[in-house]
């Protein structure tokens, strides 16, 4: 589903994070690994504090091996991101995605994990391909 440009972007986030792990607001990662072979990554999520905000974070990437879709790994990753952010006192998580038909399962996933579609920017990526914004409110105690 991801283009080579998208894969390159995701890899650059990893490189940036590990090149300077002491940066003040680093990209953060949650990884799902195989229980028998921890080197085998099943999926991951990348998230971080939205610059110039107080308590808002962005989910940059959440990806699961396509052969494992529907097995609950994405939900576990998403729930762990939400747990970490709540523990940090954050109040909302913002997600951006495409309106293309091949992203329909992704948009349905965000709805299933409690996100709400907040906005659309028409023709953002290209004509007929909107940028869709979802928000997950994070209840903190």
Place the predicted regions along the sequence by residue.
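Acetyl-CoA-dependent GNAT
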Residues: 1-67, 75-80, 84, 88, ...
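Active-site-proximal loop/turn and secondary-structure-junction residues that shape catalytic pockets
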Residues: 63, 99-101
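Conserved G/P- and acidic residue-centered "switch" motifs that form tight phosphate/ATP-binding loops
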Residues: 72
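Conserved GNAT acetyl-CoA-binding A-motif
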Residues: 85-99
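Conserved catalytic-core motifs of GNAT/GCN5-like acyltransferases
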Residues: 96-99, 111, 115-132
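Helix-turn-helix
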Residues: 106
